[in-house]
C-alpha cells in the first residue's frame, strides 16, 4: 500500500512542490483519509495503531519519490504526534494528539535556534511559568511545517539555573497564540 500510494499520489506532484516550495495539502489530506497521518498512534487517540516499523516503511517509500513530503510527514507524525503521545497528559492528547493523528491539523517541532543550532543543551529560548500560562521569549529557525502547522512542539529552557541540557520543557504552542510570529521562510537548497 505504501509504495503504491507514493507512486500514484506523491511522485506526480514532487517536482512541482519542489519548484513552488508549496506544502503538499492535497497529499496530506489523502494521507489523513487513509489514516497515514497518525500511523503509529494508537486507535484510542485517533491513529491507525500500526507499528513504528510500519511508519518507518511508509516514510521510506515516500522519501524514494519526494524527500520534502517525507520530511513533512516524519516531522508531523514522528515528532509532532509522538512527542505528545509519549509525554503528554490525557488532556493534551485529547486536545492536540487526536486531531493531529487524524490529519485534521498539521504539527511542527521547534528545537533549532539561531545561536544554538539543534543542540538542546544550548537552548536560549526561555519560558517563564506564570501558573496558568507561560511567557516565552526567544526565536526558533528551520521549523519543518512552520507557518503551515497549527501546533508547535517547542523546546524551551524553563529553569535558567539548571546546567546545560537540564531544565528544558516542551510546550505545545498554538499558531494563533498572541505574540507568536512566523517570519518569511529562509531560501535553501532542497527540502522545500
Map each language-model feature to its residues.
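Flexible, small-/acidic-enriched active-site or ligand-binding loops
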Residues: 122, 176-192
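N-terminal glycine-rich flavin-associated loop
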Residues: 71-91, 117-120
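Short Gly/Pro-enriched turn/cap motifs at secondary-structure boundaries
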Residues: 100, 115-118, 142-145, 161-162, ...
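Conserved protein kinase catalytic domain
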Residues: 59, 81-84, 97, 153, ...
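A structural signal for short hydrophobic beta-strand segments in well-ordered beta-sheet cores
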Residues: 125-128
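Amphipathic, small/basic residue-rich leader segments at the start of a protein or domain
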Residues: 1-74, 91-95, 99-102, 106
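A short core secondary-structure module
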Residues: 133, 137-183
Amino acid at each position: 500500500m505504501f509504495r503504491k500510494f507514493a507512486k500514484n499520489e506523491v511522485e506526480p506532484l514532487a517536482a512541482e512542490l519542489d519548484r513552488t516550495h508549496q506544502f503538499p495539502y492535497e497529499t496530506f489530506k489523502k494521507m489523513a483519509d487513509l489514516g497515514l497521518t497518525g500511523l503509529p498512534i494508537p486507535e484510542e487517540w485517533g491513529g491507525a495503531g500500526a507499528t513504528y516499523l510500519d511508519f518507518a516503511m511508509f516514510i521510506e517509500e515516500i522519501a524514494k519519490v519526494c524527500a520534502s513530503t517525507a520530511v513533512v510527514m516524519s516531522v508531523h507524525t514522528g515528532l509532532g504526534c509522538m512527542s505528545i503521545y509519549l509525554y503528554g497528559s490525557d488532556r493534551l492528547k485529547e486536545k492536540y494528539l487526536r486531531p493531529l493523528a487524524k490529519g485534521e491539523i498539521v504539527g511542527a517541532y521547534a528545537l533549532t535556534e539561531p545561536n544554538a543550532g539543534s543542540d538542546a543543551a544550548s537552548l536560549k529560548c526561555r519560558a517563564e511559568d506564570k501558573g496558568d500560562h507561560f511567557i516565552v521569549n526567544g526565536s526558533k529557525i528551520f521549523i519543518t511545517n512552520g507557518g503551515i502547522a497549527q501546533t508547535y512542539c517547542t523546546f524551551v529552557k524553563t529553569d535558567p539555573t539548571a546546567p546545560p541540557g537540564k531544565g528544558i520543557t516542551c510546550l505545545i504552542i498554538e499558531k494563533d497564540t498572541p505574540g507568536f510570529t512566523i517570519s518569511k521562510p529562509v531560501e535553501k537548497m532542497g527540502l522545500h
